[in-house]
């Protein structure tokens, strides 16, 4: 099959970009004829080995994947809405009406596609600060985002306590995000492992929040975060336990000012992770919403069937600076920024809709005016929204100055009267763990050496480790490998 320029690419200047990408594709191990990465060629049919498929496949955009015209136009509306919320926040920052801005510009296509392939309020989501379009597609509103931008008390993310674009929405199964980028990888794996443990331990199933048996966990990072230790810890655990996690890397080529080839060995995270077992790998043009939707559909289907985690490497662009505390003109040449502008998904997807006869230029212009009016109204409302009362600033905050064991401040239970030999501290901790695990099936123990014998077939013939200091001795024997 010969390589063909995808339909979403505009004419003229963008053609050179696509040609350059195709050269890079072959240099990275892709065959223009076979469209299969060289690391996957030796895999046996049906084997549980990494599968790497090509980006920029023109067939993807020719196939609408069962999406009707209303949905196809809706994709554009959400993408445009996301971009215009970014633009409104930038405007408000210039007017000193908000405190910070970090955009999701250039990432919109893959994010709307991800939401479309998943189930809002059913699956679980651990996004990062670029994921505005994902949150809009899941059901968050522009009004709610602008409440967050101004730090209003009504902000659903954190009631005005978090920075903007730090997503958290209880109704949509989006736990609150940390500013420490990369931690969401561990949080996502933890959520998936809760589902995994519940599937193994019957007593857990009515105690794990949101457990349905086939829920999928989404998490995303930028290319820079793949150099963080949390990322690799999470990926290793997910592959080892075949957890239903979709790892999405939104690769815009920069970690603030650091180019991807400087921060990532070889400049391609897909190559680095291609040897992980049980991992489905898909490399996709993240500026193409239909290609991205096809990739996510495959990933979601695999995870729902509990075949293992999935990895989506989406190549996107960053048309704006990292944030309003950054100026990309200091380190990015004009010609590079112009190349990105030529393949901006807001532009190319609108052209696709018109070229395919799905929407006319007049219809899209009317849609844009409607969105702009919606955002202007939402901004006016947000600016007038009450801020959190200053006296509430310390609510729900841990105090390092108050000793929770101080009998003068808190009532405490009288000490137990012991008889006989109490044993060592290790004995007491071990006994406590046995009692607590008996009482509460939600307690699981994991880590190096905690098992009596990780190869359970030998449990009957060996004494067992049970921790370096024997603190976890016999927990595995009593409660099973699903909990220890």
Could you say what each language-model-derived stretch is?
Residues 84-87, 91-241, 259-277:
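Cofactor-binding active-site loop characterized by glycine-rich and histidine/acidic residues
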Residues 301-311:
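Long, amphipathic alpha-helical stalk/connector segments used for oligomerization, subunit docking
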Residues 101, 126, 220, 246-248, ...:
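Structured core elements
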